[in-house]
């Protein structure tokens, strides 16, 4: 396969991983194969039950924060996606035992800049709005976890935020979700409100 086709095949897998785990650029770039973890509570995901992040955002003067991001059922399509990349695409780069998940055609680790470039190319190909950037995938991930009704603390931990207020800034829930929430709360406050009066 020509090198440009390998690059084109790698980019979608990498971009989808940003969304499926809500990672920052640096976190994704720093991933090694050893960072893919099993989750004993979700054995069906095999080695993709969780991702161990070693290069999380640090506070001033502190080392990078580490955390584990669990694969959630709503995003479990990433399991087959990563399996395909690791078994079919990555070996074609001839990287041997290089530890990085995301590798270049010259057997090095991909850069943050290359992630931006791949996202820009995908955005233009899909005719998406110009103002979108790669970090928007992280915002979408956090919003979707909220809409999937995960607890706030779980979402905060998945995102690697030190404060719940930071996570709240990332969340932009849909009107449909807000309507469902009001419907649920009204049902709790006024039992039988949604029953058909006969």
Predicted regions and their residues:
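Conserved tyrosine-mediated DNA breakage-rejoining catalytic core shared by Y-recombinases
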Residues: 30-81
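C-terminal catalytic core of Y-nucleophile DNA break-rejoin enzymes
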Residues: 59-83, 97-120
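Basic, Lys/Arg- and aromatic-enriched nucleic-acid-binding interface segment
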Residues: 1-25
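Catalytic-site neighborhood detector that most strongly recognizes the C-terminal catalytic loop/helix
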Residues: 159-185
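Short, basic (Lys/Arg/His-rich) helix/loop patches that form interaction surfaces
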Residues: 108, 116-157, 161-164
């Amino acid at each position: 396969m020509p090198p440009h086709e390998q690059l084109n095949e790698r980019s979608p897998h990498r971009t989808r991983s940003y969304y499926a785990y809500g990672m920052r650029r640096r976190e994704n770039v720093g991933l090694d194969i050893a960072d893919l973890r099993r989750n004993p509570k979700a054995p069906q995901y095999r080695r993709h039950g969780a991702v161990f992040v070693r290069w999380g955002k640090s506070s001033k003067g502190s080392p990078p924060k580490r955390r584990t991001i669990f694969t959630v059922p709503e995003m479990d399509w990433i399991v087959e996606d990563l399996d395909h990349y690791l078994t079919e695409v990555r070996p074609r780069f001839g990287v041997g035992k290089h530890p990085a998940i995301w590798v270049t055609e010259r057997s090095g680790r991909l850069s943050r800049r290359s992630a931006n470039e791949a996202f820009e190319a995908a955005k233009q190909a899909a005719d998406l709005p110009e103002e979108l950037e790669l970090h928007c995938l992280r915002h979408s991930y956090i919003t979707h976890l909220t809409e999937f009704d995960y607890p706030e603390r779980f979402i905060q931990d998945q995102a690697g935020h030190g404060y719940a207020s930071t996570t709240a800034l990332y969340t932009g829930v849909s009107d449909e979700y807000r309507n469902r929430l009001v419907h649920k709360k009204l049902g709790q406050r006024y039992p039988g409100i949604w029953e058909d009066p006969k």
